[in-house]
Curated annotation (Swiss-Prot):
<feature type="domain" description="Protein kinase">
    <location>
        <begin position="164"/>
        <end position="462"/>
    </location>
</feature>
<dbReference type="GO" id="GO:0005524">
    <property type="term" value="F:ATP binding"/>
</dbReference>
<dbReference type="GO" id="GO:0052150">
    <property type="term" value="P:symbiont-mediated perturbation of host apoptosis"/>
</dbReference>
<keyword id="KW-0418">Kinase</keyword>
<keyword id="KW-0723">Serine/threonine-protein kinase</keyword>
<dbReference type="InterPro" id="IPR000719">
    <property type="entry name" value="Prot_kinase_dom"/>
</dbReference>
<keyword id="KW-0808">Transferase</keyword>
<keyword id="KW-0547">Nucleotide-binding</keyword>
<comment type="similarity">
    <text>Belongs to the protein kinase superfamily. Ser/Thr protein kinase family.</text>
</comment>
<feature type="compositionally biased region" description="Acidic residues">
    <location>
        <begin position="117"/>
        <end position="144"/>
    </location>
</feature>
<dbReference type="GO" id="GO:0039525">
    <property type="term" value="P:symbiont-mediated perturbation of host chromatin organization"/>
</dbReference>
<dbReference type="InterPro" id="IPR011009">
    <property type="entry name" value="Kinase-like_dom_sf"/>
</dbReference>
<keyword id="KW-1048">Host nucleus</keyword>
<keyword id="KW-0945">Host-virus interaction</keyword>
<feature type="binding site">
    <location>
        <begin position="170"/>
        <end position="178"/>
    </location>
    <ligand>
        <name>ATP</name>
    </ligand>
</feature>
<dbReference type="GO" id="GO:0004674">
    <property type="term" value="F:protein serine/threonine kinase activity"/>
</dbReference>
<comment type="function">
    <text>Multifunctional serine/threonine kinase that plays a role in several processes including egress of virus particles from the nucleus, modulation of the actin cytoskeleton and inhibition of apoptosis. Phosphorylates UL31 and UL34 homologs, two critical regulators of capsid budding from nucleus to endoplasmic reticulum, thereby facilitating virion egress. Modulates and redistributes host components of the nuclear envelope, including LMNA, emerin/EMD and the nuclear matrix protein MATR3. Phosphorylates envelope glycoprotein B (gB), probably to direct it to the cell surface.</text>
</comment>
Amino acid sequence: MERAAERLARQRARGLWRSRFACCVAAEPSGSRLGQSVRGAAAAPARCAAEGSADLYLAVNNEGPEVAPPARTGPPDADGIEGGAAVAGNEQGGVAAGNERRAATGDEKESASGGENESESESESESESESGADDGDWDDDDDAGPAGGVTREEAEGAARALNFRIIRRLTPGSEGRVFEATGPAPAQEHVVLKIGASASTLAEAMLLRTLDHANVVKLKAVLFHGELVCAVLARYREDLHTHLWKIDRPMALPTALQVTRAVLQGLAYLHSRRIAHRDVKTENVFLNGPGDVCLGDFGAAHGPVTEPRYYGLAGTLETNSPELLARARYDCRTDVWSAGVVAYEMLAYPRALFDSPAGPQGEDAEASGPPTILGDRDCARQLLRVIRRLAVHAEEFPPSPTDRLTRNFKRHAATGREPHSPYRCLAVLRLPCDADRLLHQMLTFDFRARPTAAELLEHPVFGAASG
């Protein structure tokens, strides 16, 4: 706790708005057919945001992509949660420079992308110039180079050519550039632009075109400028991580349950369509208010997920499920675990349930320099942290001796806790019985015993919260 408080104080002293947890995994699938499909539409390089993106793209776009779909109205502003804009759908599935929450990846080729800087106030942003707004703490020298095959100047030129006025630059990722902008006259609507020469940018946009749910970010349009893909997304007041940073305290239980239910509703919708998000975290939960919540950033999404098997490594180290960290078989319930970590963070802020593995200079080392892609050993260290933090009993591991999670990690099981008993580390939250039970169910170690998102929505705690 003392180290976490000191780290938070240092971040605030430096004026950092960048998320601690914006890094995630991206692995390029072998034998991907995505590049060929996308080159025909936009002549973009064949790179995938996360392993499995090619299958997902082809599954939902068998007849090829359509461009510039009709604009869809984003959610209205709502009272209750204040703040600046948030990127609804910034690329994850990669590594953002300079952040503390780090990524894991395996032997596959990495295709890194990054999260956004947290937004500043609207009054500050509107005073910025068209060609380049304040970058916050982002280094202009680092920002000038290519990201996702496109330089800052190229991306800004494309935005202007498409009649968008840039308000603010957000942290670029290796899949492309991200901006807050106003759209063409007469509406001049505030939106978020994702501009890149990456096939995964188009694949994510084409996936979002097929989704229509109140708790899933809305795509407004997909535009092209030469070889560049421009996804136009809804703009939200803030993301959940920023909101927690600003209030600097745990959320009230009713509000946390309201947000948790919205996240589970979005996941239940995705899972009914056999899509796993694979990167649920506070940075990817966007809010206009506690009753207006959506999931964004589908750069790591995979589908169709039809049965438990290994679909590749993706996501964020601290929020990844045990089965994904072990590179074992998994299904859509991997998202339920991640949603449980998000729920804990809302209720325990600024405490984190699972800190990232210690870096070369120790846990307190400030993140600096270029991003780091983490490998199997980092995933293993993180999984050991999960096992030790929850004191997972041997009987709570998957029963099959051939399961990678059981085969490689059961020997590290704890002995000081009864199997299937409450996690001691959750007792400090002092939750009511129903809420405590919900959190324990979401954090069930063996995903085969973990409820689905749809099943959790029937939990009595949500009836009590809405009553």
